[in-house]
């Protein structure tokens, strides 16, 4: 039989390529992707694919999808898809990203081009999907939030058919009436929040929305099920947020909220939405957590000498930036060594520029680059630069890290200057670990520029630099 690898444009054939256990196969009207643990089968539908079946290979359990609509939706209308194509490409491992098989499904809905990129990893019971849009959108994503006071009781059958949120990242519709779920929401900004994880137990029986980045769904008859992981910021700070991330409706589970508006989609470039991961697990809590952890281990290549750390930060004694200087840091390094600290991070105060949190001289995060020396070591505090600190750290087996706050004004328009400042610190002092702080991301353009900053630094440092927060970005 004829098997094409790497690239396939649909005209009634099929494509297969394996990354060890990973595969992508298109035969006639059926697309199948998976590995040795999980398989997801789709109806091709001109490229606007519809999940047909999901299989857990570890226990032989298979679920048929009872929805007849495409997995991804940006409008309530369903125009005929065109230009459907498939690419299957093995992606090599880098210093920070593991190898995976990329299965790229592209199609058009009138003037809108859509690209769904599936990431499949060996020995992982989950498949990730990144979505990109380009062109013109003739609809408004999402709808008006329904007030709780306007909701009717379960006896009102028509109310059970409440309007579905238009924008859908992914969905699966199980058979049966005994489905349960657990949503998990997270909070950031730890200066203000001390309760960081919120879980909600759900008995799915009608269409309701829930907040969170994680949804576990399982059948009450055998406790086996799936999880959806929405790869996005915390719910409270997502872009274009409609108040919910997941919808549950008996056995139907939906991921919603793209993180963009129709105005962010243009004909001249691809715009990425928030990502989504669908994973499967067997019976019990341990199986759920192991499945999730298996995927998380594939987000970044693990290297013990780089990624394991016991970090000490100078901000912790509540003196803010009033104490940090060469003498203080050298003394702290000696104590850190006795405690077994592996990384010593100098927080706000090491630099010439003053932040709004400074007790020495009130500064600002706005117009940082009015002072071209903002991100150089303060000569009053560090007359010899950071060289003595780095040198003593190496002697004690402690790596030095720094605090850094990107220039937030105008959607991170100065990202290139910020990137060069980080690159210069790496080249002069060998600083690899940076705490990125104070981020405010008000728009898709700001998010894009922030990714550009991170990617530029990684490119120029041969992926040696480590940020405390960084998501995969192509």
Task: Give, region by region, the residue ranges found by the protein language model.
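Aromatic- and carboxylate-enriched substrate-binding clefts and catalytic-loop regions
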Residues: 345-474
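Conserved, mostly hydrophobic/aromatic
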Residues: 37, 131, 268, 312, ...
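Sec-dependent N-terminal signal peptides
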Residues: 2-14
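Alpha-helix termination/capping residues and helix-transition junctions
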Residues: 123-124, 335-338, 428
């Amino acid at each position: 039989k004829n098997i094409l690898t790497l690239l396939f444009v649909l005209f009634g054939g099929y494509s297969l390529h394996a990354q060890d256990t990973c595969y992508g196969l298109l035969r006639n009207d059926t697309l199948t992707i998976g590995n040795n643990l999980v398989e997801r089968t789709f109806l091709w539908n001109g490229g606007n694919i519809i999940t047909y079946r999901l299989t857990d290979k570890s226990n032989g359990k298979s679920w048929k999808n009872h929805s007849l609509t495409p997995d991804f939706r940006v409008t309530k209308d369903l125009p005929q898809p065109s230009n459907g194509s498939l690419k299957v490409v093995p992606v090599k491992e880098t210093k920070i990203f593991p190898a995976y098989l990329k299965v790229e499904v592209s199609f058009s809905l009138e003037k809108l081009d859509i690209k769904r990129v599936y990431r499949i990893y060996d020995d992982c019971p989950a498949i990730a999907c990144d979505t990109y849009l380009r062109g013109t959108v003739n609809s408004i994503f999402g709808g008006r939030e329904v007030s709780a006071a306007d909701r009717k009781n379960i006896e009102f059958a028509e109310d059970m058919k409440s309007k579905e949120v238009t924008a859908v990242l992914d969905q699966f519709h199980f058979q049966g009436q005994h489905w349960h779920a657990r949503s998990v929401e997270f909070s950031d900004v730890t200066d203000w929040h001390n309760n960081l994880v919120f879980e909600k137990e759900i008995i799915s029986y009608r269409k309701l929305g829930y907040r969170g980045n994680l949804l576990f769904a399982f059948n009450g008859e055998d406790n086996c099920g799936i999880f959806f992981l929405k790869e996005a910021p915390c719910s409270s700070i997502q872009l274009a947020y409609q108040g919910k991330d997941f919808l549950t409706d008996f056995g139907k589970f939906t991921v919603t909220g793209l993180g963009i508006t129709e105005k962010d989609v243009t004909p001249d470039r691809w715009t990425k939405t928030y990502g989504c991961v669908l994973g499967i697990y067997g019976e019990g809590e341990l199986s759920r957590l192991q499945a999730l952890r298996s995927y998380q281990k594939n987000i970044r290549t693990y290297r013990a000498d780089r990624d394991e750390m016991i970090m000490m930060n100078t901000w912790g004694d509540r003196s803010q930036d009033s104490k940090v200087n060469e003498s203080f840091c050298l003394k702290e390094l000696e104590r850190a060594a006795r405690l077994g600290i592996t990384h010593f991070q100098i927080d706000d105060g090491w630099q010439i520029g003053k932040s709004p949190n400074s007790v020495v001289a009130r500064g600002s995060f706005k117009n940082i680059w009015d002072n071209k020396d903002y991100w150089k070591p303060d000569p009053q505090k560090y007359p010899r630069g950071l060289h003595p600190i780095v040198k003593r750290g190496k002697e004690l087996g402690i790596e030095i890290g720094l605090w850094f706050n990107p220039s937030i004004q105008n959607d991170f328009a100065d990202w290139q200057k910020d990137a060069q400042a980080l690159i210069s610190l790496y080249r002069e002092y060998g600083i690899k670990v940076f705490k990125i702080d104070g981020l405010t991301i008000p728009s898709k353009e700001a998010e894009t520029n922030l990714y550009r900053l991170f990617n530029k630094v990684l490119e120029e440092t041969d992926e040696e630099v480590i940020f405390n927060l960084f998501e995969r970005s192509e």
